[in-house]
Amino acid sequence: MEIVIAFIAVLFVAIILIPFADVKWKGIITITAVSLNTLLSCIVAIRALAGISVVEILPGSLVTGLIAVRVDALSAWFILIINFTIITGAFYGYNYLKAYRSQSANLSLHGIAYVLVHAALISICALQNSLAFLIAWEIMALASFILIIFEHYRQDTLKAGVNFLIQSHVCILFLMLGFMWVALKMNSYDFSAITAFSIQQPMLINFTLLLVFLIAFFIKAGFVPFHTWIPYAHPAAPAHVSGVMSGVIIKIGIYGILRMLLLIRNDFISIGYVILIFSVVSGVYGVMLATIQHNLKKLLAYHSIENIGIIGIGIGLGCIGLGTGNLVLSTLGFAGALLHTLNHSLFKSVLFYAAGNVYQATHTMNIEHLGGLIKKMPKTAFIFLISALAICGLPPFNGFISEFLIYSGMLAGFKGAEITLVWILVFSLFGLVLIGGLAILCFTKAFGTVFLGHSRHPQHTSPAEAGPGALIPMYAGLSLIIGIGIFPTYFIAAIMQPLTLFINKLGPGIPDQAILTFNALNRIGPCAMGIAVFAAVIFFIRKKATQKKPKSINTTWGCAYIAPTSKMQYTASSYVRTYRKLAEPMLNIAVKKEDIKDIFPLRGKHETHPHDKAETWFIDIPLRQLQFFINRFSFLQNGYLQVYIIYGVVFVTMVLLLPVIYDRIIALIQFFNQL
């Protein structure tokens, strides 16, 4: 109880101090507040991961009833992920926002929102009362909206924020529907009532209830086709907010899915198929669109959708394993999902911070205008490269570890599987392989175009490397990216407690085949270190051998062409042209070009602009139809005050009469039933 009180006290003190502090101190107060609350919540989380769950009962009110605060191993795992990303984001943001210190009021609002987002995320993981959960979820949505619209004077930023806010409240509507459904039947808002409700109901009702919650959490996590807010919100927000949104805010949707799987008794095979299919589609579609983006942050945003798909594949496999009694499939699926949740929060937040460095140095996110930054920003380029290798799932970095577990789970699922499951697994395996291949294509494009070659567009100022304030949080994330890849044993041990919550449904203990898979990962570290030492020795020998010999630096051979320009380099579009031509039937790509007609043309033009086909189908077209329908009632808005007063009178009359009419109808039905 003392920790809960201290947590709330830190939150309120920060909210009071930030508006009145000097502009230089606002960021320091924000960092201090999130650091203190990180320390408090980590104490509880570490105890829970050690097997000591924490339960506190808060008094609540007449409406909410008693409010249970329960931190089990699943909550603890997500709390630790949230805390690390929030801390690195706070330190990076302090440096990033120095350029905006003339906007004191804006910085105050931003600092308050950042502290609130952190508190709301921790509360969502800890609260086990549906009304309190919804309040925390709403605080998270509103505070995230404020963080996104930091540059509210830009029309595209404001539009992205409003889009996020609308879709967040659609998510909340589905959450309310699910929670109210249970509360009306069980007369309780405690999460234990959800389990009690599912025990009493047939599987069809439970499946429907879980689907309602899944839609809500799919929207927050960004599964296709509920992903359409992500490509707008991530590029619009400041870099540290983009890192936090991709690293942990969308992961709260993953937490919700896992929590409901624990609470609701269900047909795990059916729900596993649903999650798996949505996840494969999300992963493939996300990386397909990421590969053809021109905006660096939008490219990273679509990769968030791709990685949410990878996490979902692990969850889907785990559910199918529970349903079929395949303990190995279940163990490796859930283990891969839990570990990839951490891994993605690390490399994606670091990538967004690197994108922030690029933006502050060049004032553009257009990949087609960039190039040659490795000469000006070598540290940022190195960090981006390592993070890109990690997100592509290459050893010896963290992305490889979690994806290896998911691949191993798929292969284990074929043993003794019926024909339907075999086809589903083949489909999933093909999808995961395609995701990995396209991710490599995408990030070779991104790194090569942004950091190699020469600048493709004149810069108003010479780009410079970011300072230590920006680089230190990135190095912190990078250390874990490398650490998990080389020493996976310690991090696999950390997920054992949350993993046990799921696999205990089949029986106690980790199966031997899964243990062998975990042990196989231990060989990666020594192999990687051996390769690194060998490469260092070769580099040292080469350097010593050439140290005393004369050196000359010349331009790359240009096939005897003596007047090269930066326009002759590969662009981001031309690099992926072959892929783009193959994928055009599945993607919505607008092409603008000016045909060359003269023998000696002065100029030519060819542009490609990718659009989200899923957004067109599932958002734009339905909204146009809804707008057409609503416009049929535009005559109601006629501008006459007298008519508006009549509307009010009619509405109040209906509110007063409906209960009476309802009671009479019920009485009439009961009368006829008696006959």
Short names for language-model regions:
Residues 46-56, 180-191, 317-323, 396-412, ...:
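Membrane-helix interface motif
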Residues 490-529, 541-675:
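Aromatic-capped, Gly/Pro-kinked transmembrane alpha-helices
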